Regions:
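Membrane-proximal intracellular helices of multi-pass ion channels
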Residues: 1-182
Length: 182
């Protein structure tokens, strides 16, 4: 269900944000298929049917979120994994409601699982922010393009905003390091 929500939600947002941009001029059926394809591939393989460098800022953000979350455990997709996100959402919800514990489907979440999910999320965010800052110091590209490259590297997706070929060697090393960490 988490994967379905990600795919459908990502596709709908991509379609809305790109209808008058990279999807303009395509038949509606093709726009829907491209949106679904983009939503799936942003979490996994990094293939593209549209020019990712020409995406709107909103679409880049949605794509970065999909790359950050990635796929489900057991898949070859990168990212922090859907289960990590679900554990953290349940944890936040339980704390906002001041519940005694975190329960999912009538089962209590173990404190260790919550701790591990928090560490994965915080470590990934730290590496993404650090990588973005290093690349911004060294490169004259827009923040959204640099962040797109960093999220893609960390999520081991392979998508590009089109700047990878033009970055300096130090920035390439940052991206390679993030790929290994991801």
């Amino acid at each position: 269900s988490t994967t379905g929500f990600q795919i459908i939600g990502g596709a709908v947002l991509f379609l809305i944000l790109e209808k008058n941009n990279v999807l303009a001029g395509m038949p509606v059926k093709e726009q829907i298929l491209c949106s679904l394809f983009h939503s799936v591939t942003a979490r996994t393989a990094g293939f593209n049917t549209t020019d990712t460098g020409a995406l709107t800022e909103g679409s880049k953000l949605v794509t970065m979120i999909l790359m950050f979350i990635g796929g489900s455990p057991g898949s070859t997709a990168g990212g922090i994994k859907t289960t990590t996100v679900v554990v953290l959402i349940v944890f936040v919800r339980a704390n906002l409601m001041e519940a005694a514990g975190c329960n999912v489907f009538n089962r209590r979440l173990d404190e260790t699982a919550i701790r591990k999910a928090s560490v994965v999320m915080c470590t990934n965010l730290f590496l993404i922010l650090t990588g973005t800052i290093f690349m911004e110091i060294m490169q004259p590209f827009s923040l959204s393009d640099v962040m797109f490259e960093v999220f893609s590297a960390m999520g081991t997706v392979g998508m590009s905003a089109g700047i990878t070929r033009d970055v300096c060697m130090a920035s390439r090393m940052v991206l390679v390091f993030l790929m290994f960490c991801g």
